[in-house]
Amino acid sequence: LQADHRSVVRSSFRNAGFARVSNISDRQFTFDNQATDIDDIFIFENVIVLIEYTCAQSSGVGEHLKNKKHIFDKILADPVQFLTFLENRFSGITEQLATGYHPQQKIVRIVYCSRHDFDEKYKANVPGPVYMDYPAVRYFAAVSDAVRRSSRHELLHFLNVDNTAVGSAGKITVSTSSNEYSGSLLPEAHSHFDNGFKIVTFYADPEALLRSAYVLRKDGWRDSLNLYQRMISRAKVEGIRAYLKKQKRVFINNIIVTLPPDVRPLNSKHETIDSSTLTQTAAVKIKLPDRPNSIGIIDGQHRVFAYHETADDDSEIALLRVQQNLLVTGIIYPQHLSNIEREKFEARLFLEINSTQTNAKSQLKQAIGLVLEPFASESIAARVLSQLARSGPLQGVVEQHFFDTNTLKTSSIVSF
């Protein structure tokens, strides 16, 4: 069990492009009068991730965390001193640690990976680490297996690492960049969306979308009940990738996305255009910030991530990633719209798109119902059942995660 747990976590970091420091795992040392060890260290550029594994049963995790709290606090209180200590203590580690960066530019994160669920109060008592609970472990294993190095942006987001602080080849870029695309803006009278919604269409290269995109997947790590998108499928990604290599052409159907609030449709003078004053479609410039996790994909995640980067990058795909352009329809929300209203809008749109292809599965409809009609009988039943499965008498009996086997499906029970 322990070996399998470590293997799954290691594969996620390796697939994302992190390098494992090989000669320090499980070796005892004393730092600041505290005897301890580190289970694993992974590095990407100036980001250093210290990983602590445990396969203790739920009842024993609290004690394990309590024993680790002191060393976690000491490391996070002075990460520069700790990294200097490691370089002096373990010969050969200097070459594996981030080179070319000032010590103050190095970012240290401690990740605590428990194989079993445990009480949330222990996390509150030991707030230092990033907690990669087992569902998150399996989630990143699946995502990184499907999209390899292109999973790195989401993993860094999970680690609460600001991407602007992450270096490249020993350098950290201070200025912010953006990509400008030619597109068209639909008048509000022609879209029939509510007032203030802007609909723009433009062509964007897959590389830019891969750097900027995120997907709110139902089985992901984000702490929200209002998630409904399916897990990414490696088989589907590989199928589209094979098509791209064989046909050398893009899919012509739209990628549907939400754009960050600072995006504005601009005219030739780079002035913001008011779509409410338009009587016909207008040519515009769309300036997208080159910022990870800023463009939300509502429909088309497999078509975008089929261009993903790998360790030994496929030369054909690498070329198509920058040469080809995907047709993108972007939605810019009104400034005053709340997060709840945005989630409802996206859920309704997602259901409309997917229910026209085939009959949407009851599981999908129920997940979207939680967003659109939270007080409907099915939504209440689904939430109650989920809570009972998480920490009640139905724990281990009802399916909670995409990787659960030999369990009853929530959608079947709720429908019944």
Language-model regions, residue ranges each:
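Amphipathic alpha-helical segments that form well-ordered structural scaffolds
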Residues: 8, 12, 239, 243, ...
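Intrinsically disordered, low-complexity Ser/Thr/Pro/Gly-rich regulatory segments
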Residues: 1-173
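Solvent-exposed functional surfaces
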Residues: 37, 312-416
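N-terminal leader or domain-start segments enriched in small/polar residues
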Residues: 95-98, 102, 107-111, 115-293, ...
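Short amphipathic alpha-helical segments
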Residues: 4-5, 71, 232, 236, ...
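Short, flexible loop/turn elements at secondary-structure junctions
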Residues: 44, 55, 259-261, 299-302, ...
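"Short basic amphipathic alpha-helical interaction patches in structured regions
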Residues: 64-70, 270-272, 308-314, 347
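A sequence-level detector for short glycine-anchored, His/Arg-bearing signature motifs
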Residues: 286-313
